[in-house]
């Protein structure tokens, strides 16, 4: 009988621990990324202040502290990231290195601390925040 109680307690503990939270589906991409530099295809460079991409599950949030916050859908396939911002205006996306409400980025570099995205419009360099 004592063994049965221990078995039930062990099963309950395993269920409780495994039920906590959602696991990241995007690997190192999940989290908040601060934009360190934007290099436009025209050759111009920009260093935005307090601008971030936040990625979780299939959602992307673009935020510039005290200025704007834009939310959309994203799909990550390992070597590319496709962002769709259906309710955003293009002028609200420009400070984030996007020139349209649908943007495909090539993932040129991704570690747990650094991210480099490349589109036909701009190259973005991030650090994990």
For each of these PLM feature ranges, what is it?
Residues 34-39, 57, 84-90, 120:
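Generic short beta-strand segments
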Residues 83-108:
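An anionic, turn-rich surface loop/hairpin at beta-sheet edges
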Residues 5-11:
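Sec-dependent signal peptide recognition
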Residues 16-19:
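C-terminal motif of bacterial Sec signal peptides marking the signal peptidase cleavage site
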Residues 106-125:
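Short, exposed beta-strand-loop hairpins at the edges of beta-sheets
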Residues 45-88:
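N-terminal glycine/threonine-rich, aromatic-flanked beta-hairpin/loop signature
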Residues 21-23:
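Bacterial signal peptide processing site
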Residues 28-44:
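Tryptophan-anchored aromatic micro-motifs
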């Amino acid at each position: 009988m004592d063994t049965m109680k221990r078995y039930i307690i062990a099963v309950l503990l395993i269920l409780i621990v495994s039920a906590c939270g959602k696991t990241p589906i995007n690997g190192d991409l999940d989290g908040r990324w601060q934009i360190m530099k934007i290099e436009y295809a025209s050759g111009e460079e920009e260093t935005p202040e307090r601008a971030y991409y936040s990625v979780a599950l299939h959602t992307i949030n673009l935020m510039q502290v005290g200025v704007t916050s834009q939310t959309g859908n994203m799909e990550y396939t390992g070597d590319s990231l496709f962002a769709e911002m259906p309710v955003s205006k293009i002028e609200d996306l420009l400070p984030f290195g996007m020139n349209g409400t649908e943007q495909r980025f090539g993932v040129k570099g991704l570690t747990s601390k650094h991210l480099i995205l490349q589109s036909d419009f701009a190259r973005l360099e991030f650090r994990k925040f």
